Amino acid sequence: PTIKELGCTTMLPDWQVRVVDGNHLASTEKRLGALRQERGAARPGFSVVVYDPDLDQVIDLQACEDAYASERVCVLPLLANAEPGQVWLADRLYCTLPVMEACEQVQTSFVIRQQAKHPRLIQEGEWQESVPVETGSVREQIIQVRGGYQCRRVELTLHSPTDSGDSSLMFWSNLPESVSAQQIAELYRRRWSIEGMFQRLEAILESEIETLGSPKAALLGFTTAVLAYNVLAVLKRSVEQAHRETQPDGWEASIYHLAVQVRSGYEGMQIALPSEYLPAIPVEKLAQRLLELARNIQPKQVAKSPRGPKVPKPKTWVQGKA
């Protein structure tokens, strides 16, 4: 509720966007007793994370200690908590009939990229006329799978292939006709926002601690970093909202610089300010209080400094003798 009061933009009007993806913790050389005779490094586990890109918040996650379990199975308990009015974005790994049936049971919508071994099609409708978009052209058709279940299949033909060499992408969706095929294709492009969130978790908050070999400890470290990220995202939004009128368009606060500011001053505040000087603030007044405090921050100290594009340097030959 607090971050919504601080203002936010929406990717798809009148819809709550949820991006779901798995985050596998890297293998670690920290050996548990049962693995000390094994050569390979152990994988502590993984988490399936539900991310709200509009609010920049992790909404839910399912932690799994078995690093080799299926993400498709672990996502089902998360889908049980989905609600009508939400649209879930997922990669092709989740293009399975149980995942789509779980969405139908809770009356939530989805946009899932098609994989090679997708559920067998019972019937395919005619393709509609292609419509040009920024990155290529889009067309759609109605498909039917086992059990009489129907959904829309959208094909995006790209002007230039992706890094993996794909020249066309297909998405399955049960969004209503009020959401066009162009909007579905554009919406899926924003699925990569969760990858940026994972990168910030690891680089800024050290969510993947290499010395933790125990699955419980490693997953506790990851979930603690997720909780800290949500708090920093609220602080980031409050700083941006407080200085929006005085800063140029596109100005953003940096979660990294905010984390540095919190880390550098926290111990001193614990010593200088006893607990009675830090009273509890009601939830309904928290957003206003955060804005009051954010106005005291110098924007330059927490401004985001995006790196410009790399300019390729010409390679020249050096004349030499053996």
What are these regions (language model features)?
Residues 12-16, 23, 27-30, 41-322:
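Single, function-defining residue in the core of a domain
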Residues 36-38:
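Extracellular beta-strand-rich solenoid/capping regions of secreted or surface-exposed proteins
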Residues 33:
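Functionally engaged cysteine thiol sites
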Residues 1-16, 21:
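Electropositive nucleic-acid engagement tracts
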